[in-house]
């Protein structure tokens, strides 16, 4: 239930996220990693892509047939670049002219917005991929969008703010949907049972996956209350299937320290609820282009030469006895290997900056770069990252950390 990003090495370079078969166990079962890329006005990735008109301009054409043809081309481009779903279109309502995201939304009219939503997602489907309608729901402003409570009557919600989503779902043109950052009447959208289950699945018959927006927050699915981006328990209970995102290679080791495992132990989350999310994710993968692609293991262990034990330069840590390396203030340490073999590198890191900051550190072994550690700021908190597999010989490896400066 954890997606990884941005620019995950398992999928197309420069895209927003990978989800699905991200752990060694899931990959061994033959579950691939699906790919999603930012949109909606074209495909965002490392290489070249086609720029499309913004949503407001498309709706001003009053021509859903033309919009569907345009997005059929977009679907073909997604398919050709091995991207399974575009993170768009945005189908929220133009509630206020100063909303910073109005450019990507269609209009202030629910029916026009819904018609264009069906046309664009239908075109992507015709082209061989899927579109992700967002932001579900009532995402009407950019200022304070992480915490502004959208207080609204049920009648207005259904007749105005949900209609464009409802039309696309009932047309059968979407299999992926993204929730909003904001709470609605006190319940965060990413863990809102009424939205994700009662209305979306039970009333509208939606059978695809639901994902959060990037680094979204959730709160108690019943009581509401305080929000947290680690509350995957209530996300899953609401039937929101995928948390977007944790650091690359962080899904298997729970790098975001979410409450999934502890909630199972406490009896506040059931295996059945997790299985329900897994079923939704696997069903999407079976309907996506990724199921047609060859299953390729991108995490192939690379071999690194050791040096004799008498060439150890720093404090020595034995891989079998210590099972870890602690770097000193000079960012140096020596790793001793008694038995050659394949090992997985897992690191605990802390970066005393906000999430908006980024840092990169090379880990050099005997003068050769062995692994690159990339992270956003963690506000001084410790997180865990699973990095890569390596083949090591008997002997020692003199390790040194090297900060990469922009």
Where does each model-flagged region fall?
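Glycoside hydrolase catalytic-domain context in secreted enzymes
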Residues: 1-342, 362-370, 376, 391-398
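Extended, low-complexity, turn-rich repeat/linker tracts enriched in Gly/Pro/Ser/Thr and Asp/Glu
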Residues: 79, 350-359
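Aromatic- and Gly/Pro-enriched, solvent-exposed loop/edge beta-strand patches characteristic
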Residues: 378-382
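Exposed aromatic-hydrophobic patches
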Residues: 384-390
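Short beta-strand-plus-loop segments that form exposed binding edges in beta-rich domains
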Residues: 400-405
């Amino acid at each position: 239930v954890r997606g990884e990003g941005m620019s995950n090495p398992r999928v197309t370079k420069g895209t927003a996220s990978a989800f699905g078969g991200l752990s060694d166990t899931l990959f061994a079962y033959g579950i691939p990693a699906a790919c999603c890329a930012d949109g909606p006005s074209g495909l965002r990735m490392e290489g070249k892509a086609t720029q499309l008109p913004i949503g407001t301009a498309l709706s001003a054409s009053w021509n859903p047939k033309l919009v569907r043809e345009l997005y059929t081309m977009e679907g073909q481009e997604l398919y050709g670049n091995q991207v399974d779903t575009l993170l768009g279109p945005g189908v929220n309502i133009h509630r206020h002219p100063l909303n910073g995201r109005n450019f990507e939304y269609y209009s202030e009219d629910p029916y026009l917005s819904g018609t264009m939503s069906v046309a664009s997602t239908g075109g992507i489907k015709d082209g061989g991929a899927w579109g992700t309608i967002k932001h579900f729901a009532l995402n009407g402003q950019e200022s304070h969008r992480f915490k502004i409570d959208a207080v609204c009557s049920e009648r207005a919600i259904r007749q105005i703010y949900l209609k464009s989503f409802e039309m696309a779902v009932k047309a059968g043109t979407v299999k992926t949907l993204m929730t909003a950052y904001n709470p609605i009447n006190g319940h965060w959208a990413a863990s809102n049972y009424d939205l994700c289950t009662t209305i979306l699945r039970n009333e509208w018959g939606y059978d695809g996956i639901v994902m959060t927006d990037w680094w979204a927050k959730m709160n108690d699915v019943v009581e509401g209350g305080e929000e947290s981006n680690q509350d995957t328990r209530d996300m899953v209970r609401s039937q929101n299937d995928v948390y977007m995102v944790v650091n690359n290679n962080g899904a298997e080791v729970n790098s975001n320290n979410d409450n999934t495992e502890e909630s199972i132990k406490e009896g506040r989350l059931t295996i059945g609820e997790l299985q329900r999310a897994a079923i939704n994710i696997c069903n999407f993968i079976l309907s996506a282009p990724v199921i047609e692609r060859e299953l390729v293991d991108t995490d192939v262990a690379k071999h690194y030469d050791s040096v004799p034990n008498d060439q150890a330069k720093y404090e020595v840590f034995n891989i079998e006895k210590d099972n870890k390396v602690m770097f000193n203030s000079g960012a140096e340490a020596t790793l001793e290997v008694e038995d050659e073999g394949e090992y997985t590198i897992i690191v605990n890191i802390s970066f005393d900056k906000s999430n908006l900051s980024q840092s990169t550190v090379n880990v050099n072994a005997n003068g050769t770069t062995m692994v690159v550690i990339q992270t956003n700021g963690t506000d001084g908190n410790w997180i865990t990252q699973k990095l890569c597999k390596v083949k090591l010989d008997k002997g020692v490896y003199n390790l040194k950390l090297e900060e990469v400066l922009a």
